[in-house]
């Protein structure tokens, strides 16, 4: 499927559209993930037997800054995490969704999701606003410093939440990232909406497109 590329508020967005779309999936991606979206969309259609959705990929230029809810030290390499998630959510809520509403009048439901840090961002956004009916947090970076305290003190607003993790993701020498298994179970226990935790085979880098498709399909 050939996407339509549109710049909205200087943010590049890719629209994978169906003329009869009545629901919209919004997914923050990097350049590498753009190349996997065709396979992801194909898998969503296969799993759901449903073509009536619009997928909008939002290209993220600075992954560690634009998707992080607050500042945190680096866990690998030297690059730490910024606090740009609020700006990214503001763009989606105040500019992207109004554009979609005006251009695709049949769309009435919005879903947000992503992989890795984009999965954490999607979870965090679900705590900030009720505009998203469902959240797909696929192999989310729930090891993020302070996330455990945050979910204990807050309640998610989305009606449905999909969580998944690879069964080998916690098997790492990195002490912070090795907590991801414990943290994803904690996240699951803290949710009070319709939710599921699915375990995938493999490490963090195994089939992100297929895993993400499974998440959106469950929603």
PLM features: residue spans?
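Gly/Ala-rich beta-loop-alpha elbow adjacent to hydrolase catalytic centers
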Residues: 113-118, 122
């Amino acid at each position: 499927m050939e996407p339509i590329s549109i710049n909205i508020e200087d943010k590049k967005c890719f629209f994978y559209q169906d003329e009869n779309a009545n629901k919209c999936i919004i997914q923050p991606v990097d350049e590498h993930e753009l190349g996997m979206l065709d396979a992801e969309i194909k898998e969503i259609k296969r799993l759901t037997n449903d073509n009536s959705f619009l997928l909008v990929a939002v290209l993220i230029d600075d992954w560690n800054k634009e998707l992080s809810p607050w500042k945190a030290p680096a866990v690998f390499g030297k690059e730490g995490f910024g606090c740009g998630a609020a700006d990214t959510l503001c763009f989606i809520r105040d500019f992207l969704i109004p554009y979609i509403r005006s251009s695709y009048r049949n769309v009435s439901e919005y879903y947000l999701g992503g992989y890795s840090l984009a999965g954490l961002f999607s979870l965090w956004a679900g705590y900030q606003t009720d505009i998203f009916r469902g959240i797909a947090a696929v192999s989310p970076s729930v090891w993020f410093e302070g996330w455990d305290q945050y979910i204990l003190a807050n309640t998610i607003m989305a009606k449905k939440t999909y969580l998944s993790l690879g069964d080998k993701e916690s098997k790492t020498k990195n002490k912070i990232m090795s907590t991801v298994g414990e943290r994803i179970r904690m996240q699951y226990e803290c949710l009070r909406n319709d939710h599921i935790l699915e375990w995938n085979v493999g490490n963090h880098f195994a089939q992100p497109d297929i895993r993400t498709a499974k998440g959106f399909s469950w929603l």
